[in-house]
Amino acid sequence: MKTFKCWTDKMTFRTFTFRAFYVLHFSLCTLLVAGCFDEPEPAYKSVPEDARVYLKEQGLVDLKGQSFDASKVDYLNLDRNALTNVDEVASLTALKWLRLNSNQLSALPSLGELKSLRRIYLSDNKFEEVPETLKDLPSLTDIDLSGNPVSEIPEWLAKKEGLEFLSFSRTKITKLPDDLSSWRRLKALQLGDLQMTPDEMARIRKSLPDVAIVF
């Protein structure tokens, strides 16, 4: 079996999706996927540099003492720290991209004021449930919860419209909700390395025939 290295810092999830489909449908090789979720590059590059905040790999345990322009920050990268809470993020009303991968988070503050937030990346944290505050985000399109001990997808998320990209790889999820009709805009769904039965995988494919799904 041939293994492909799929994750790079510069790869976008849309690039990954097309690459995954190429391998899955036009090659006899097997694609092993994990953590290949990223923001769309063209949209990311459109964010002015002074609206981007990079605090990746800074050893942060909290955000006390960090100064943010709440009306200006579009993009916030807090990947690979040791954060256990991010309460200060709740006031960043202009935020569209939020990266919190590889921290120590088990909960989020209320994010209901972040009406512009479109993409949130939460992989490799300690979430046992999908944070319910995501229900209150009307612009949300992308959610990455891969590598968390999440065991089920709540009904409110199954009914949430407007979603385009979801990743639940390397979680404890074994089945999806029965009704997935609200995910009609979904473009890609990562369900890699889950303990799903063949029947459940077949049901998901049938329910979402136009979605790029990676099991």
Where are these regions (language model features)?
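Conserved hydrophobic beta-strand positions in leucine-rich repeat
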Residues: 53, 74-78, 98-100, 120-122, ...
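Leucine-rich repeat
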Residues: 69-72, 89-95, 111-117, 135-140, ...
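C-terminal motif of bacterial Sec signal peptides marking the signal peptidase cleavage site
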Residues: 33-35
